[in-house]
């Protein structure tokens, strides 16, 4: 997820080569419903810097019945390495259900062919823990105001972390499809569906607690950009 699309970012860079600027995007601020307990989910980021170097702050998480189930915050230094790609390094903090975890992060962010927005990051934590995360998004503009946004995300872990109910290997797959209406570019209500599938050992942890390994949820929310 990018604070603005990389195409917009390149246009901004061409208009103003030297100035430092910033942006704040709350890409998902939504309510999710699957017939059971409703959840509040957020995903957002902010950045500040010039054309070549930026400081990024990313956060995402989920609250269920007033309790933070899972959340993460990343602080990253972003360096442009080509017209469409940047290298990112920094830290990530996980909190919520289970003990907190700290990670060092190294990844890339940019535009793949056909304007797919890609984030791919590797992580190293204490006690020999490793992880990886890949996310792909695409904005399909139907009209000047209507935009369809499909997305997919995968999380992998190098070793099991029973305290956080995470298994080794592919832990989960998340896919979503949202239709937003841009009343203004900075303010867009949306609705859609989100699907999550727990995999391998992570799914086994869930089943041991009589929880399902997959869920399909209706979502409705706001996208805000400052």
Language model: regions and residue ranges:
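Outer-membrane beta-barrel initiation region
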Residues: 1-67, 71, 75, 79, ...
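Extracellular loop and loop/strand-boundary signature of outer-membrane beta-barrel proteins
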Residues: 60-63, 92-94, 105, 120-122, ...
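Transmembrane beta-barrel strands of outer-membrane/channel proteins
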Residues: 28, 57-61, 89-93, 120-124, ...
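Detector for outer-membrane/organellar transmembrane beta-barrel domains
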Residues: 100-162
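Repeated loop/turn-to-beta-strand initiation elements of outer-membrane beta-barrel proteins
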Residues: 51-57, 83-87, 114-118, 143-148, ...
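Residue-level signature of outer-membrane beta-barrel architecture
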Residues: 48-50, 79, 110, 124, ...
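Residues that define the transmembrane beta-barrel architecture of outer-membrane proteins
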Residues: 20-22, 38-42, 69-73, 100-104, ...
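Outer-membrane beta-barrel "beta-signal"
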Residues: 176-182, 212-226
